[in-house]
Regions:
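A positively charged, amphipathic N-terminal helix/segment that binds anionic biomolecules
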Residues: 1-70, 74-165
């Protein structure tokens, strides 16, 4: 029981630290969402905003390939419909669970539509200065979160886990 208590305490302490870092994370995400065009940091900020607002898992290329299950970074253009300010996600997630999630956000809808307009079937990708397309990965999202938070936070910190107590 002592080990379980210690694990819960560590998780609780991490949640407190994440909560304290959240305002700075949100501020930087807001700045990056305002960038012109569709640079890497704008696409990463879009994924982080969606992590927070939808609680969709970040995703993993291996899961997508092996299990045909998706998360934010592995979504394809066909997994989201943009209608005005409405974003509607429909995809199979971890453990084969079907997800149907809708949010209304004019700014995110506009950015996601721009992402869909980039050639290729991956939703979250950007084109670099040399004209090369790059898909956003979970590693990219986690590195971005570490950079903007100044701490070792990851996409998993946005997704609620089992109860602490």
């Amino acid at each position: 029981h002592a080990l379980a208590r210690r694990a819960r305490r560590c998780k609780y302490d991490r949640m407190i630290a994440f909560g304290k870092a959240l305002p700075a994370i949100r501020e930087r995400v807001e700045q990056d969402l305002a960038l012109r065009g569709l640079p890497r940091d704008k696409v990463l900020a879009t994924v982080v905003r969606l992590l927070e607002t939808t609680l969709i898992r970040v995703g993993n290329l291996e899961y997508a390939r092996r299990n045909r299950s998706f998360g934010l970074t592995t979504l394809r253009d066909r997994h989201v419909k943009v209608r005005g300010t409405q974003l509607s996600f429909a995809f199979r997630g971890k453990s084969g669970k079907d997800h149907h999630i809708s949010i209304a956000d004019r700014h995110l809808a506009r950015i996601v539509k721009q992402c869909q307009d980039v050639p290729g079937y991956e939703l979250f990708q950007y084109v670099d200065d040399a004209g090369q397309r790059h898909q956003i990965s979970a590693d990219d999202v986690n590195a971005y979160l570490r950079e903007i938070s100044g701490d070792e936070f990851s996409a998993k910190d946005f997704v609620p886990g089992p109860a602490l107590f």
